[in-house]
């Protein structure tokens, strides 16, 4: 996750464009050729001036295999995805999902209308900045247009691909929250650590 304040973005549009271009290019590099560059990324990240952790530990999640416990290594090419599946695109529906989890677990103590989730997501996620950077990366010859979801309205299609199998539609967050078996529901509030 990479975020900037609205003030910084407004005052530094060229820097924001350059940063976003760099993040897109790095994400493409990490995922291209079946993750072929991940071993080099692991070595870079292991350096003391960056993460400074043991390269073998970083490699566990970065190189397409994961060791769940001693001796239990499994192929997991999508354990970390940086660019595939439009992973870098700032979908409003992703922001709305985070907000639904905050509401579900009481970090947002009171009901919010579906429109509040949409407005909040749109106040933070800026696909127009991302699209401008993607177009610049394409113009620079470092990507192809078909690699990007330029037609996106900011919302992914409804999906039931989460671990619980519950269908999530970012355009109907309250229906999603109410469909979950545990967590706060419509009409419930949190006050003084108690659910009312």
Task: Spell out what each predicted region is.
Residues 1-66:
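Pocket-lining segment of extracytoplasmic ligand-binding domains
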Residues 49-196:
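Segments of small-molecule ligand-sensing domains
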